[in-house]
Amino acid sequence: MRKAALAAFASAALTLGGCAGDADTTGLSGATWQVVALYTDPGTPGGLPADAAGRASLRIAGDSMNAMTGCAPLRAKVEQTSERLTLVDVEVADADGCIGGSRYVHDTLTSLLTPGAAFDVRKLNDKEATLTVVSDAIDRPSIRVMAL
């Protein structure tokens, strides 16, 4: 009886472990992620300017990312795992006439979201994540996003 109970427990643990592994492989795919903070300088708060709040977002589906920089659409081909996002090709539309906080967010995002850029992805929970630039720098730039 005890052996049967242990076998059932082991089988359930392996099944649940397999499910947990599948959940981790999605990375940021499937949700629309709103950019809520940009951390590029340790001496500067990362919050977005009031006139730019809610204007920048990104969505990843398969090997494609569609984003809005606050001023212009951005499209990229990506490679991803649950812990890494790498941009392969990036196209950004013209942002002429964009000013103020939205322009600041646009300029910051387009300086980070470049071909070859890689980010460590850290999901804080199902609705919040950070994308931190992969580099040897001590204070690596990062993008904080919230799922809509």
Go through each PLM region and give its residues.
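C-terminal segment of classical bacterial N-terminal signal peptides
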Residues: L14-G18
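Lipid interaction determinants
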Residues: R2-F9, C19-L148
